[in-house]
């Protein structure tokens, strides 16, 4: 994929994350700065989502660790364990917020 296609896909991912957090009414603030989306919970915990254009990867940093995801077909899959991006992020958000959360729909 071209760099502009990757940037558009990653913008769409950031939009989906922010929308899902808003729709769930989580006690969390999101801040998007350049290639980084920071999710901060009332507890002070944070989850960081970063797009890495050079490698065309999406990265997640959370208390549970750091994860790198590459596009495979229509999904973003972790290089370390084959986990799916949205499932991994949902678990990190549940852990940080202490609330039920998913990306269904």
UniProtKB/Swiss-Prot annotation:
The keyword NAD does not apply. GO terms for molecular function: ferric iron binding. InterPro entries: CyaY, Frataxin/CyaY, Frataxin/CyaY_sf, Frataxin_CS. SUPFAM superfamilies: Frataxin/Nqo15-like. GO terms for cellular component: cytoplasm. Keywords: Iron, Metal-binding. The keyword Metal-binding applies. One of its GO terms (biological process) is iron-sulfur cluster assembly. Belongs to the frataxin family. Involved in iron-sulfur (Fe-S) cluster assembly. May act as a regulator of Fe-S biogenesis. HAMAP family: CyaY. This is Iron-sulfur cluster assembly protein CyaY. The gene is cyaY.
């Amino acid at each position: 994929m071209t760099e502009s296609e990757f940037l558009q896909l990653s913008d769409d991912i950031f939009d989906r994350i922010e929308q899902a957090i808003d729709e769930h009414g989580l006690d969390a603030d999101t801040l998007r700065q350049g290639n980084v989306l920071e999710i901060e919970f009332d507890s002070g915990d944070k989850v960081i989502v970063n797009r890495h254009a050079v490698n065309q990867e999406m990265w997640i940093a959370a208390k549970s660790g750091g994860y790198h995801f590459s596009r495979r077909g229509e999904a973003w899959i972790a290089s370390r364990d084959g986990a799916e991006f949205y499932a991994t992020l949902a678990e990190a958000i549940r852990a940080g917020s202490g609330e039920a959360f998913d990306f269904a729909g």
